[in-house]
From Swiss-Prot:
HAMAP family, alphabetized: IHF_alpha
Record-level Gene Ontology MF annotations: DNA binding; structural constituent of chromatin
Designated name of the protein: Integration host factor subunit alpha
GO CC aspect terms: cytosol
Family the UniProt entry places it in: Belongs to the bacterial histone-like protein family.
SUPFAM superfamilies xrefs: IHF-like DNA-binding proteins (SSF47729)
UniProt entry keywords in alphabetical sequence: DNA recombination, DNA-binding, Transcription, Transcription regulation, Translation regulation
Free-text function comment from the UniProt entry: This protein is one of the two subunits of integration host factor, a specific DNA-binding protein that functions in genetic recombination as well as in transcriptional and translational control.
Subunit: Heterodimer of an alpha and a beta chain.
Biological process, per Gene Ontology: DNA recombination; positive regulation of metabolic process; regulation of DNA-templated transcription; regulation of translation
InterPro entries: Hist_DNA-bd, Histone-like_DNA-bd_CS, IHF-like_DNA-bd_dom_sf, IHF_alpha
C-alpha cells in the first residue's frame, strides 16, 4: 500500500496523457466534472459513477453528545454530511490488491 495522495493537478495530467486533450483543456474538463458533482451534491442529489461508487449527502439530526473531559452533555446541532459508497467492483479491486489496473465495467 503506497498511501500517497493524488492531487487535482495529477488527475488533470492523467487526463492529458490518456485522452490527448491539451493540458488546459484537460484541466478545464476536470474542473467542469468536479463542479457538476459539487453542484449536484449541494442540491442534495446523488452522484453515481458506474464501477466506482456513489456520493450522497445525508442529513444528521440533532443529538446530545458528551464532553469527554467533563462528562457534560453538549447538544450537537443538525448537519449535512457527505457519504461515499464504493461500488462492489471497486471494493473487490481494493481487496484483491489490483492497484494500477484499469476499471472495466
Amino acid at each position: 500500500m503506497s498511501g500517497k495522495t493524488i492531487t487535482r493537478a495529477q488527475l488533470s495530467e492523467a487526463v492529458y496523457q490518456e485522452v490527448g486533450l491539451s493540458r488546459n483543456e484537460s484541466a478545464d474538463l476536470l474542473e467542469m466534472v468536479l463542479n457538476e458533482m459539487s453542484e449536484a451534491l449541494v442540491e442534495g442529489d446523488t452522484v453515481k459513477i458506474s464501477s466506482f461508487g456513489s456520493f450522497s449527502v445525508r442529513e444528521k439530526g440533532e443529538r446530545v453528545g458528551r464532553n469527554p473531559k467533563t462528562g457534560e452533555e453538549v447538544p450537537i446541532l443538525p448537519r449535512r454530511v457527505l457519504v461515499f459508497r464504493p461500488s462492489q467492483l471497486l471494493k473487490a479491486r481494493i481487496n484483491d490488491g489490483a492497484v494500477g489496473s484499469q476499471i472495466n465495467g
